[in-house]
Amino acid sequence: LAHPATPNDEGSLLARLAEGLGSGNLDHRIFNRDFSDAAVAEPFAMPLADIEQADAIILFGTNIRHELPLLHQRIRKANTHRNAKVYAVNPVDFDFAFSLAGKQIVAPSKLANALEDATLIDAVKGATRPVLIVGALAENHPQAASLRAAARKFAAATGAALCRIPQGANAVGLARNGMLPAKRDVVGMFAE
């Protein structure tokens, strides 16, 4: 197991070492619990700076102020300078430094269904540059695969750019460098 902040060169060497030893038991997704959709970290669907140009932003399962303060600031800028409408769908009523056009505070088991809310979908459908940001609470949820599926469905229905926050400083780099299981994932390794 490697921490998701491990540098690319170390992750790549570890992956090659594991392969040379005949082991496919390696992973960097130490915070994830649901691997049923074999999800890995991926780059945002748009450049980070472009989020300031969004006119509708949906925060899904994230305390963005804590997870990525720089992104929180860009959302604040979009909200205050461009009047972007920001919506939050979370299990906790987090404090943000920008105003929310709407929020749904739901039980963790109801997060996936919250994105099916017709009012939220209609509000976002009218936007020209909508963005859906999926955070740690969704990515590390016990049913994260269903939450990711709900996020993909919502993004497709509304035309929103899907931006999943990587769960580690170098999670995208490690995924690209092969630091992924060929056999057992993190949950499987700990179960043994």
Region spans (language model):
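Catalytic alpha/large subunits of respiratory electron-transfer oxidoreductases
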Residues: 1-192
